[in-house]
Amino acid sequence: MKHKKKLIALTAVCALLAYWLYPDQHPVYPASDHYDPKTQTFFNPEPQQKPTGLTGAFWKILTDPQATRPPKPLPTVKPDWQTFLAAPEGKSRFVWFGHSTLLMRIGGQTVITDPVFGNSVSPIPITMKRFQPAPAEIDELPPVDVILISHSHYDHLEKDSVQALNSKGNSHFIVSLGMGVLLKKWGVPQERITELDWWQSTERNGIRYTALPARHDSSRTLTDHNQALWSSFAIEHGGEKFYFHGDSAQGSHFDKIAEKFNGFDITFIENGQYSKHWPNNHLFPEQTARYAAQLAPKRFMPIHWGAYAMALHAWNEPLLQSLPLARSLGVNPLTPLMGQVFDADTATQDWFAEPLQ
């Protein structure tokens, strides 16, 4: 029995090493201002500063959870699916599940962004655990028409969530260029995958999706760094326009996006997981507020917070710092509870600033 257990353990270790050390084969794409066919990797037109002090930063995150995690469960509500699905034409509705996972009801279609429902967003699953369960599980969701994924990092692309959604029906995946290789490996048929390069668009059932630049990176293993692209997205239907930020540091691409779209109904912009140790990977709170103002939305909703601690700041620090500045710049924030059905006109409270009950 002991030998059998050792053999099983050895097999598991070998499988994990094979996954990490042997990369998937990606197509070679045409050369561009953000892709090098010689190295078969994407890059940022504006170079990133290399992260520093990662070991110490992540060790503090792991060993001092009181500094980064809420002391009590965050308030949530169970989604009212009847209200969500009854979104009238021109009045899209949304549900936030924490971090960057949003369910959108637009033009009679249901769209989910960066679906991550798992307990951990780390390749080492005992780390970076979710603060609490999502307000609903995947099995409780209404049928999903489109799955929109910005990039391949674990907190935006989760194998279990992808496979669970894929098994529920005929959802179509719209993803950044290069991500199809992994999705097909996980069982998603080629005909249900659309990959987009920056500034490319696709239309499904009257909804237009456009991949937009971001300043970030991608990887899941030791050997696949930047083999898939990272993007933000514009989503347009009728007279409505929404912006889903994904992950991105500050850059000149924001100017181009603002000029191209001339305002949005709601911008969903990352507001969390920043650090001086990785200054060119995420927006700092002041940058989030200024970028939100630059995009001229009716409402700005901070995302990329509320579910996982992946940086050294307190769980609510991003909002406490960004929202006062956003308001001073004329931006109207939107801060629903996780699970709450909301739209561009929903009145919300700064619940994150109050003591947790």
What spans do the regions from the language model cover?
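Acidic/histidine-rich helix-loop elements
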Residues: 115-134, 217-224, 275-281, 309
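Cap/insert and terminal regions of metallo-dependent hydrolase folds
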Residues: 22-29, 35-37, 146, 153, ...
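Metallo-beta-lactamase
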Residues: 2-122, 126, 134-137, 177-244, 321-341, 345-346, ...
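Short hydrophobic/aromatic-enriched beta-strand-loop microsegments
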Residues: 113-114, 173-174, 190-199, 265-270
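Conserved G/P- and acidic residue-centered "switch" motifs that form tight phosphate/ATP-binding loops
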Residues: 114, 151, 247
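Active-site metal-binding motif and surrounding structural segment of the metallo-beta-lactamase
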Residues: 126-174, 262-268
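Catalytic core of the metallo-beta-lactamase
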Residues: 101-105, 203-263, 279, 283-287
